[in-house]
Each structure stands twice: as C-alpha cells, then as structure tokens.
C-alpha cells in the first residue's frame, strides 16, 4: 500500500510505517503524477484536493486531512467517487486557544493594560473559539460569543449579535471558517467600516483565516487608528502576506497558532485511527507514546500567580516573542512563509508543564487552564 503524505506531518513513520510504503511530498506543490498510484493520501490545508489532482488515480482508498477545516477539499468530488475522507476536527483547538490566550497576556504586559477585567468577544464558537473561551473563563474573564450558525442549531450557550459584541468587547478574537457566499459569509467579515467602528483601544486577533479580515482595508484603518492593536497569525494571500501590513501587527506569525506538538501529533493520530478503522485492523499505537518529556519536570509555586507570573509560566511553555521575531526576519524571503512553517520548532501545550503548589484550591483555575500536576 502506497501512502503519499505531506512531508510536514509529524509522527507519520511510527504511526503508518507498518501499514505501507510512506512517500513524503511537498504538500503545496503536489502534482497529479505524484499521487496517481497512491492508495492513501494524507494532506494538510496547503493542498487542494480535487478532480484536477486525483482524476488520474483509480486506486485511491482513503484521503485524510490533518486539519480542522475542509475548505481545501472537494468533498462532493470524493463522495461522488466513493473515496472515504476524514479530517481531524478539534486536533489543534487547544493549541489555538492557548495561542490566543498567550497573545492577550503578551499584549497586556506590553501596554501595561491588564487582561483581568476586560471583556473578550469571540467570533466563531466552534472548536478553536471554544478552546479560547475555556482559557479565558478559567482565568475569570467575561466572554461574549457570536456564532449565528451555532445559535440556530440550538447550541445552549448564550450568544450575542456581532453588533453587540463589537460594541461591548475590549478584545476580539476571530475563529470562524472561511465562507465566501451565503447568509453567513465570512469573507471580509471585518471590512473597513466594521474595523473603524471598533471601540477605542480594541485588540483584534485573527487565528482562523486571513481573508476573514480585508487586509488592504486593515492597512487603511491602521493608518488612521494607532489605538487598534493587532495579533495576526493568518494573512490574505498566504504564503505571501502584504509586506506593508506586517509592521502594523504587535505580534505576527506564519499561520502556526495550531502548531503545538500535541496538536500536530493529534491530527496525524486521528487519521491513523480512521485508516485502521477503514482497514478493519486494530489501532495499536497510543498518542502518549509519541510525545517526548517536557524539558521542565515541574515548577514549584510559592503562591498563586498574578498576571505577570502567569505570563512567565506561559512563556516557559511558549514564548510568542520568538516566533514574532523569526517571522519579521523571514516572511519577505523567497518561500520564507512556508519555510518558517516547515521548520517551526514544535511548541508544547500547557498540559506539558506540571505545577506544584500546596494550596490546591487557590490554583484550581490553573488546572482549568490546562496545566498539569497542579497541587500536591
């Protein structure tokens, strides 16, 4: 069995090595010739999976995408050919939620404007938006959720209109899929008028899809509104972001919010489980067996951390400033965006860091944030 796989997917060999011949490829430049005799195709969001790619292949048994979204996959085409498909919903939700939360802590420290006491509006209450809300609520932050689709489906959580969210939120974090048409279109959801209407000193974070924000309009808005603070992990025109936009962001990264070691491993692992199910063979591997030990055994707390100390704990796990510096130095180089993604050092999630503290009830919120070993 030939398994064609994006070369940037981790843990492919230990998970799939016993199932067939693994053929690593560049996902962004994948050609029909490279997949014409594949039995299994494993991709990420950089690969367009459609008739143009797969028409020459008559033996494909399974397509898997180690992603939350599926907008890069022609699902109707696969269904029409009877090719099973699976993605990995929620695989990197924790990573994105923690990235957004850490970015807010970093902004709070940079501008001496505590996160505690602010109101955060989350646009899109799916996996990543919910994970962001979980972090914020664990820390005691008021969260407003906007998701008209979830609301219409009967989701029991309380939702507000986008207009209410824009009026009340001090911080806005975007977590919607890209939808280009229809009643709930998200393409350029944040256009010039909407961004100009934001409250003074709003923080705007985009960790979903670059074109949810009109990037050209964002440049115009920032030229008029220095009070608007930006965290941009995604960009219109990826892998070629607008060079003039980058300096306007307080933190800028190359679409790596979901790039935790746990999240990336979880995405590959979910596809492994699905393929084993399809082949009717037992899934004998375990996710926990793949992850290396964290470089800190534990951090002992003498007292419950304040916001400054919480940021330091977060930096033990992931220092956003490092990725920001790498991005600014490398995004304009030839293939710089994709090279940074490919070579990104795998950060860990909060769960990798064990905290020891005698008064456990005072730090239950750290457990809810995701840190392990809290209390003793």
Curated annotation (Swiss-Prot):
Listed SUPFAM superfamilies: Formate/glycerate dehydrogenase catalytic domain-like, NAD(P)-binding Rossmann-fold domains
Subcellular location: Cytoplasm
PROSITE patterns: D_2_HYDROXYACID_DH_3
Keyword tags: Cytoplasm, NAD, Oxidoreductase, Pyridoxine biosynthesis
UniProt GO BP: pyridoxine biosynthetic process
Entry annotation: catalytic residues: 209, 238, 255
UniProt GO cellular component terms: cytoplasm
Catalysed reaction, written as an equation: 4-phospho-D-erythronate + NAD(+) = (R)-3-hydroxy-2-oxo-4-phosphooxybutanoate + NADH + H(+)
GO molecular function: 4-phosphoerythronate dehydrogenase activity; NAD binding; protein dimerization activity
Residues binding NAD(+), per UniProt: 147, 233, 258
Record bears the keyword NAD: yes
The protein's annotated pathway: Cofactor biosynthesis; pyridoxine 5'-phosphate biosynthesis; pyridoxine 5'-phosphate from D-erythrose 4-phosphate: step 2/5
Family: Belongs to the D-isomer specific 2-hydroxyacid dehydrogenase family. PdxB subfamily.
Function description: Catalyzes the oxidation of erythronate-4-phosphate to 3-hydroxy-2-oxo-4-phosphonooxybutanoate.
Protein name: Erythronate-4-phosphate dehydrogenase
Organism: Shewanella sp. (strain ANA-3)
Taxonomic lineage of the native organism: Bacteria, Pseudomonadati, Pseudomonadota, Gammaproteobacteria, Alteromonadales
């Amino acid at each position: 069995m030939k398994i064609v796989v994006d070369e940037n997917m981790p843990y492919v060999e230990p998970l799939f090595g016993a199932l067939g011949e693994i053929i690593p490829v560049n996902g962004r430049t994948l050609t029909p010739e490279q997949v014409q005799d594949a039995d299994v195709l494993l991709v990420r969001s950089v690969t367009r999976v459609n008739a143009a790619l797969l028409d020459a292949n008559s033996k494909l048994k399974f397509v898997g995408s180690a992603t939350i979204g599926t907008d890069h996959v022609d699902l109707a085409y696969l269904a029409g050919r009877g090719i099973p498909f699976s993605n990995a919903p929620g695989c990197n939700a924790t990573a994105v939620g923690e990235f957004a939360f850490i970015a807010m802590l970093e902004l709070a420290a940079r501008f001496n404007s505590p996160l505690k006491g602010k109101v955060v509006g989350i646009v899109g209450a799916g996996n990543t938006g919910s994970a962001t809300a979980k972090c914020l609520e664990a820390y005691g932050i008021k969260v407003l959720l906007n998701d008209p689709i979830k609301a219409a489906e009967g989701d029991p959580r309380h939702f507000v209109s986008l207009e209410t969210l824009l009026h009340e939120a001090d911080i806005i974090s975007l977590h919607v899929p890209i939808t280009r048409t229809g009643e709930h279109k998200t393409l350029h959801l944040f256009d010039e008028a909407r961004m100009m209407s934001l409250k003074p000193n709003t923080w705007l974070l985009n960790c979903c899809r670059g074109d949810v924000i009109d990037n050209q309009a964002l440049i115009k808005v920032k030229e008029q509104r220095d009070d608007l603070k930006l965290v941009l992990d995604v960009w219109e025109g990826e892998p070629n972001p607008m060079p003039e936009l980058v300096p306007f962001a307080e933190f800028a990264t190359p679409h790596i919010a979901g790039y935790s070691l746990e999240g990336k491993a979880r995405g590959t692992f979910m596809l492994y489980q699905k393929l084993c199910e399809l082949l009717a063979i037992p899934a004998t591997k375990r996710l926990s067996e793949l992850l290396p030990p964290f470089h800190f055994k534990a951090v002992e707390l003498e007292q419950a951390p304040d916001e400054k100390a919480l940021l330091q704990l977060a930096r033990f796990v992931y220092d956003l400033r490092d990725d920001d510096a790498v991005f600014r130095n490398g995004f304009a180089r030839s293939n710089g965006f994709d090279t940074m993604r490919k070579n990104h050092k795998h950060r860990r999630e909060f769960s990798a860091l064990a905290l020891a503290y005698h008064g456990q009830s005072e730090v239950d919120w750290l457990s809810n944030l995701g840190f392990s070993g809290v209390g003793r």
